[in-house]
Amino acid sequence: MIRRRIVGFLRRPLGSEGGPLVSPIVGLVRPLVYPVNRAASPVTAVSPVVRPVGMRFISGPVEREAIRAGISNNTDFLHVQNILLQKDQERQRRELLLKDADNFFERFKVKTKWVLIRGNRPFSKDEIYTLFSWLLLSQIVWIVVGTTTFLSLVIMASNTMFAKEFVGETLGNILNNNKYINGIDFTFKDAMVPEWKKKMIRFHNVTMKSNDKDDTKGVSMNLKLNQVEVSLSVVKWLSGKGLVNDISIFGISGDISINDKKESNVESLINWVTESNPTYELNNFTINDSSTVIHDKANNKHLNMNIYSLVIPRLRFDHLLTDIFSADVLVGSVNDSLFNIHKRQNKLLPAFFSDKGRDNRSKTIDKNENDGRFTNLRLNAININELNLNRTGAFNWIDDGTIEISADIMIPNTDENNEGNGLKTLLGYPGGDPLVNKNTPENKYVVIDVKFKFKDLKTKFPNEEPKLSSGEKILSLNELKPVIAYVNSRSGFIHFLTSLEDSNQSRTNVESVDDNKNWGLSNISIRRKKSYPNTTVISSKPYWNSTSEDNERNLPLPLNQEIIKFHNISVQDDNELVLRCRIVQNVEQLENLSSLKISKMWDTITMEMYMDLLKVVEDWEYRNKNDWMKQWGATFASQLLLVGFGAMV
């Protein structure tokens, strides 16, 4: 039916109602309607067709839509045929050009031009500009995306073209001429080795040494780095956060000397890095197997600092303290005293973050507002003299002893681009305005719960009052007397026995009995090493056949049983002094700082320790007073009783 309508439409004269409007359409549509011989011409192929009797031609949108569909199908077919014909001609032309080429260079030239411009003609100016801009842009993208790969290829090519010593010396001169690290000479003894799998650049036998020209900083170093792996990022450098993205150091050994020219130059060991670029940031910082000796020439002492493993996922020079406390792993030792920083392994929050553990004198913190991480810090027992704690103005009355430190630290999330904080800011919190941003740096705090355990303290009466770093007095000398008396009362007996043992070891001849009577004690002591435990413990079998009464009382099954204690160790460890304090510090006050002594947190910790110490001393005085009153009352009552009995007799 559609075919009949199209035939009637085409037989109408041009310009009539419902007839064809353009003559070329007839040539496109008629091959669809009339079966033609493709070998013949289009004009002779179409013969006039007599309209059959009874055939009707209906003009309307249906007929026109059918015509358009037929024209579209035929046009697509012709377009495809034209494309195939052009490709066949191009292929034949390319084969002719390659056939005419005599050598490899001409064939390469033909193939290159054929890929670029589909021909063998000379390049035009526009094409040359296009190729140049494309090559330049591609190289820029390659450098930005693969900076480490690009630089490693450049250095590796330099190693093949020049001597390895020359390349290492050139890299050292580039770093030595940096204005930010003036005074430190870098030396690369071996060549660079690219690590393609790790996407790092590896250097071996790198030396960092202070030059003699700049000795005003008060810090000199001579360090040897066995292996250094570095990855670079141009995107990070363009954002102002430094070119180095990740850095891993393996095997640090050497000496660091702190001169006695200026007292403030002690912090310059870290300040020479932080002051160079406060916005510098490392995405991953790792140190393994580090052993250095820090010489303090002012106090004529040295510290053996060892770092076994250090992994910091993000190190920012303007948030140096908070990022170090947020380290995934930090394990090391100071003068053979272990210290470590790690994430809390239990899922429960510390007591001081709960509602029951909050202190009225400290600012209450909502843990939801900070949304940070919890870190545990621990330092094993170390001598106070090695930390120079007795040389500070705050604890000038301590002469000797050991200290053990443990702390639970809550560090807020200081990432400004954190999506979780943005969502919480948008939703707000109960009891507050949801439009107020509660996660701004002004509302973020670092909360630290510290426990100090002093043992075997020896005190002395100082000539000056204890002072803070700001010069403010903490206690007067009269207020300090009860503190010294309390410490001496707890450790005096232990120190007496220790001095007696030392005197016995130094004697070569046997003392007379009269000398021992002067001490009031027999010259007997148990010699033991410091590594021995305070309590000798013997293992015992658990009570498997426990009675029902024990189960009802929930009595634990003893696995160990204490059988003996040394005679010079008291049951309650009276020679230990435990102080606890809690510090709340705004995170903004810890920015751009390299040590706690520079910040106000050190003074806050000192004041909290003194407050806890004064409470302990006050409680000790109250108990001594009650004991004295009880003893006096009992003595007076007994005397009255004896007098009464005497009068009766």
From Swiss-Prot:
Residues 1-14 form a transit peptide. GO terms for biological process: intracellular monoatomic ion homeostasis; mitochondrion inheritance; mitochondrion organization. Keywords: Membrane, Mitochondrion, Mitochondrion inner membrane, Transit peptide, Transmembrane, Transmembrane helix. Its main location: mitochondrion. The chain crosses the membrane at residues 135-155, 629-649. It is a multi-pass membrane protein. Residues 15-134 are mitochondrial matrix. Residues 156-628 are mitochondrial intermembrane. InterPro entries: Mdm31/Mdm32. Pfam families: MDM31_MDM32 (PF08118). GO terms for cellular component: mitochondrial inner membrane. It is found in: Mitochondrion inner membrane. Involved in the organization of the mitochondrial membranes and the global structure of the mitochondria. Also required for mitochondrial distribution and mobility as well as for the maintenance of mitochondrial DNA nucleoids structures. Belongs to the MDM31/MDM32 family. This is Mitochondrial distribution and morphology protein 32.
